[in-house]
Design a protein with these regions (language model features):
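GH16 jelly-roll
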Residues: 1-201
Length: 201
């Protein structure tokens, strides 16, 4: 298996409300295919959810990386993400981060476009104080939370990182002279709840 389940306490990062538990990640069947299922559940006054990564098992440098994902409705504070982190053994953001798809941001919740508004970004820099980012967020015109699978694609070469959904280009980042994005990265999937991104605490 290429995936490791993560465990973290609530509030571990980004002021998120959930704790991550291995029990919230399952392998199942849907539409005849084997799928990873990440679930967020309220247990009393606590929320637990799922997060997996391919660190130590599968790395990528350049190429085409895509995932077919069925998303929940995010207007209530759910924050699903398909992303990557660098494996240079540096702390964030010096490791580099590629956010292929994030949904559920505060702006989308506020203006009623949460089901169509996709965020994609690059994060990098020598340390937290020197954090830089390239960022795109926009209404793609598709309901990506309609109960169907949608395909999110990263195309990555020496010059560009391009992100698309269902073969529709969302954004292209120029990385020609950005040393943070020319090394091995691993993949993560998670379902966060609340926090700074959603504006729900």
């Amino acid at each position: 298996a290429y995936w490791s389940k993560e465990t973290h306490e609530a509030g571990w990062t980004n002021q998120e409300l959930q704790a991550y538990s291995t029990g919230q990640v399952k392998v199942g069947k849907d539409d005849g295919k084997t799928v990873l299922i990440l679930t967020a559940t309220r247990k009393g006054d606590k929320i637990v959810s799922g997060r997996v990564n391919s660190k130590g098992k599968k790395y990528f440098k350049y190429g085409k990386i895509e995932a077919s994902i069925k998303l929940p409705r995010t207007a209530n504070g759910l924050w699903p993400a398909f992303w990557m982190m660098g494996n240079n053994r540096q702390e964030w953001p010096a490791c580099g981060e590629i956010d292929i798809m994030e949904m559920g941001d505060a702006q989308g919740i506020a203006d009623g476009t949460s089901a169509r508004r996709v965020n994609t970004a690059l994060h990098y820099g020598p340390d937290v104080a020197g954090h830089e980012q390239q960022y795109y967020a926009g209404d793609c015109g598709l309901d990506l939370q309609d109960g169907a699978y949608h395909t999110y694609t990263l195309k990555w070469n020496e010059n560009n990182i391009e992100v698309s959904v269902d073969n529709m280009k969302l954004h292209s980042f120029d990385i020609t002279d950005n040393a943070y994005f020319h090394s091995d990265f691993f993949i993560l999937f998670n379902l966060a709840v609340g926090g700074a991104f959603t504006g729900i605490y």
